[in-house]
Every structure is written in structure tokens, then in C-alpha cells.
Amino acid sequence: MKRKDLVKHLIENGCVLFREGGKYSVFQNPVNGKETPVTRHLELAEFAARKICKALEIPQP
């Protein structure tokens, strides 16, 4: 999955960019306060995208 598609999915489901790290962008779900890092690679493995969504408690892409 492309990173831009995952970021779009996160934003559509109410998540916000919390902060920028060295190699990661940290997204937060303001509804439940959960945070998770999203790597800046152009391509993400499907299991990684599922894990990010599960950590933020949003639907899978």
C-alpha cells in the first residue's frame, strides 16, 4: 500500500498528524487518544497498514 493512501485513510477516519519524528510521522486518534508512528517509506506492507489501523482503532483500509 502506498503511504499517501494510508495517510488519506487515516485522515478520513478522523486521525490527525500529531508530530513529525526523525523517520516517522506520528498520527493520533483524538477520539480515544491512541497514537502510532507511520514510517516515511513510499510503500508500506499490507500487514503494517493493518497494524497501524488496529493501533488507532479505526477500520482497515
Where are the model-predicted features located?
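Intrinsically disordered and other compositionally biased segments
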Residues: 6-8, 27, 56
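C-terminal structural segments of small proteins and small subunits
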Residues: 12-13, 30-61
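Amphipathic alpha-helical segments
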Residues: 2-15
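Major-groove DNA-recognition helix of helix-turn-helix-type DNA-binding domains
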Residues: 13-29
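Absolute protein N-terminus
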Residues: 1-2, 61
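Hydrophobic alpha-helical segments, especially transmembrane helices
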Residues: 3-4, 24, 41, 52
